[in-house]
Amino acid sequence: MASQSSKPQSIYDFTVKDAKGNDVDLSIYKGKVLIIVNVASQCGLTNSNYTDLTEIYKKYKDQGLEILAFPCNQFGGQEPGSIEESIQNMVCTRFKAEYPIFDKVDVNGDNAAPLYKFLKSSKGGFFGDSIKWNFSKFLVDKEGNVVDRYSPTTTPASMEKDIKKLLGVA
């Protein structure tokens, strides 16, 4: 977590929990372009988003793209099971996701994860300060700055131009 004495400057100032409850310092992603997304396994957007996320990850992981997926049960109770059930049954088996899936978080409200408070404060604007639904996406540059925010209905494939620009891929 970011220290209480200083305001976080980038996502690298945060530590989150992985799916097994271990601390992960996000500074390990320095130099990577990131898509940070809140996910759910029982949402109408699940199939298209996980399929697209997996495709875009396979296409650009070797150029420095990482996807950080955070399960969330705040929207229609669409991520109800344990994190282990969700990951094993849905993400890894069905969608063959190779990118990291983290511990379940709240993205809105008093108990929102500090990372999500930072993401929302960095890119609120048109979207306001709250996450509207599952599969809201944040694009982060190689320095850990939040560059853009995409709605749940924006497909990962339609983010490709922005991703390529940050990766420096022609």
UniProtKB/Swiss-Prot annotation:
Q: What is its main location?
A: cytoplasm
CDD domains associated with the record: GSH_Peroxidase
Keywords in alphabetical order:
Cytoplasm, Oxidoreductase, Peroxidase
Where is this protein localized, as stated in its record? Answer: Cytoplasm
Molecular function per GO: peroxidase activity; phospholipid-hydroperoxide glutathione peroxidase activity
Question: What InterPro entries does the entry give?
Answer: Glutathione_peroxidase, GPX_AS, GPX_CS, Thioredoxin-like_sf, Thioredoxin_domain
What are the GO cellular component annotations? cytosol
EC top class, in one word?
A: oxidoreductase
Q: Which GO terms describe its biological process?
A: response to oxidative stress
Active site as annotated = C43
Which E.C. number(s) belong to this protein? 1.11.1.12
User: What's the catalysed reaction?
Assistant: a hydroperoxy polyunsaturated fatty acid + 2 glutathione = a hydroxy polyunsaturated fatty acid + glutathione disulfide + H2O
Does this UniProt record's set of keywords contain Glycoprotein? no
As for family, the record states: Belongs to the glutathione peroxidase family.
State the protein's purpose. Answer: Protects cells and enzymes from oxidative damage, by catalyzing the reduction of hydrogen peroxide, lipid peroxides and organic hydroperoxide, by glutathione.
Q: What's the protein here called?
A: Probable phospholipid hydroperoxide glutathione peroxidase
* Source species of the chain: Gossypium hirsutum (Upland cotton)
